[in-house]
Amino acid sequence: MKRSVNTAPQKDVFVFRDGLPLDNGGSLDGIRIAYRTYGALNAEASNAILVCHALTGDQYVADPNPVTGKPGWWYGVVGPGCPIDTNRYFVICSNVIGGCMGSTGPRSPRDPALPDDAAGVELWGTDFPSLTIRDMVRAQKKLIEHLGIARLFAVIGGSFGGMQALQWAASYPDAVFAAIPIATASFHSAQNIAFNEVGRQAIFGDPNWNGGGYWRTGHMPERGLAVARMVAHITYLSEQALARKFGRRVRRDGMGGETAANLFGEMFEVESYLRYQGGAFVKRFDANSYLTITRAADHFDLAEEYGGDLAAAFAGTKTRFCVISFSSDWLYPTAESRHIARALNRVAANVSFVEVTSDKGHDAFLLDEPDFHRVLNGFLEGCADHAGLAFNGFGGGSALLRVEAS
């Protein structure tokens, strides 16, 4: 059978046979979690950091991605001598369940005993159960226990990963010494949901969609998935970043396939860029996984089970928090991070809030932002001192701005 998306090598995979209870009332059996680790776990198992990936990320946070060949998505942030220093910390990153890089998801066999590449295997497809971020975190907790870690030194994540970090702190406060939610929110807004729905409708409208059974034909809904990625990618940028990188510059080389260039003899550089991003995305991601994960994000509302009171989700927490936002992020604007910080202040949590000035938009946390790196390192240094992990400072250390979220 022709496979529509490459998958990661099964080098680090944890399989647990016991059923994972899901928030929808069902369960998922024979779950596989693909993960990577960096650094060494100390004798006390007290130096472990869980890094949670963003919406379409994966476990390859610091080493080359086997599908794209590109460096890890947080290369330069995670590694020896980096802000998340693997000479000091044992760093774990797993592919969320519902994903398509080795963890159980829509592209997995219905029969968990069968390998993905078994001839004629029936995949989950659109019958894969709906998931919540809490389900994903529940599976991560199983992995952490499997690794012999009772308490994580820190949980860190940006965007969709930040939601996972918040869920960890709410669901397992005794298992998290520090949490760093970055460029994120405690719930998905109507605008967030709207952008995701445009992407989903593009996938549904692709002629290869086949009711979600495209894997039977070997023809993936590439055009629809590419458009979904293009729409989403716009939200990751800022107007300033787009103006600086592209402005109104035009390409006249006729490249880009079926585009305005063929109709009008030219194409804006930003059009070419978005088409490139869409084309690259379909080579590494699965459409059904995209649907599963975006719906999980849309249904995220940490305060919902507490009657809309976000502070109640963190009542009594001993976890230390550093909430970080970026000034030009309009996908998860600073107001969302302030909302989280205020809720934590209401329960007298140990919380620091920092807005990093940047014109790079939501994706700033993935880019070269020295101020962000200093904040991240500075907070980890302080937490390490309080936890009894004595390390020398990275790059001379840094001052962490602590403000009240008024």
From Swiss-Prot:
TM ranges: none
Domain AB hydrolase-1 stretches: 47-368
Reactions mediated catalytically: L-homoserine + acetyl-CoA = O-acetyl-L-homoserine + CoA
Main location: cytoplasm
Residues annotated to bind substrate: 229, 363
CC terms in the record's Gene Ontology section: cytoplasm
GO MF terms, alphabetically ordered: homoserine O-acetyltransferase activity
Broad enzyme group: transferase
Function: Transfers an acetyl group from acetyl-CoA to L-homoserine, forming acetyl-L-homoserine.
Assembly: Homodimer.
NCBIfam families registered for this protein in UniProt: homoserO_Ac_trn, PRK00175.1
Family: Belongs to the AB hydrolase superfamily. MetX family.
Protein name in the entry: Homoserine O-acetyltransferase
Organism of this sequence: Granulibacter bethesdensis (strain ATCC BAA-1260 / CGDNIH1)
